[in-house]
Amino acid sequence: MIEIKDKKDCCGCNACVQVCPKQCISMHEDGEGFLYPKVNTDLCINCHLCEKVCPVITQDTPKEPIKVYATKNPDETIRLESSSGGIFTLLAEKVIDNNGIVFGAKFNEHWEVIHDYTITKEGITNFRGSKYVQSRIGNTFKDTENFLKEGRLVLFSGTPCQIAGLKKFLRKEYDNLITVDFICHGVPSPGVFRWYLCEELSKIAHKGDKKFSFALRPIYSIPKADAIAKECGFEIEKHTYDLENEVEFWENIETEHEKMFKEQGIKIKALIARK
């Protein structure tokens, strides 16, 4: 059974909870606001499925990219509402056009970041932009599997750890599944964000639709942001692909595609196709 002795050994993907046939695993929040699995040993039948779907315990061999593209969304408005050139929206709209399902992270009515799905292009808007908080996956791995078995085209967007957890949970390859992840520096605490909202939300004036966006100011550099990040993910020895190739490609974009790099709403534009 899953037994967390060191918090670094859990990425919080929730795969173990969703795969358990006896529903004896639940996620509990620690003092820092992160969720970790807890097993009800009275109900556990020692099937070890939770261990088999854990992306930390059972790691895959790193995979090489099939192709790498430098690309962007031609719509500047969408680029400015998005991250990394707005490519997610292009992919998601194509999936919706093919009667597919799109999963992503969004804010709920309580300003919590959760994973959800949409079957409409209007729903894609909620998934745009960076959300520097660990999302609550819920039962979206189960939902994804059900849609895949129905033959629906599915796009699932999440952190590298969440994508690894999803693929472990599915335990087979699906030709009708597209996964989208991103360069991740570690997920900040939902607990810290909750505290911030309690302290500051009353001071924030929203105009029109209620929206919340994140930005890292220079004073809050990546090393400082690590202070509220989960102890995992970026420290896992193996990745689902060769990250060095991705970073090298990204660094070459500025010189090899200067016009694209200077346009509004462009940060990282590397689209990597891999199996």
Give the residues covered by each predicted segment.
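General structural feature for long, well-ordered alpha-helical segments within catalytic domains
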Residues: D9-G12, C16, N46, C50, ...
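Short, charged amphipathic alpha-helical surface segments
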Residues: D42-L43
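Iron-sulfur-associated redox domains of electron-transfer enzymes in respiratory
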Residues: P55, T61-K275
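Generic recognition of cysteine residues
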Residues: C11-C13, C24, C47-C50, C184, ...
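Ferredoxin-type iron-sulfur electron-transfer modules and their immediate structural context
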Residues: M1-V19, Q23-S26, E244, E258, ...
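Iron-sulfur cluster-binding cysteine motifs and their immediate structural context
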Residues: I2-I4, A15-E32, Y36-K38, H48-P65
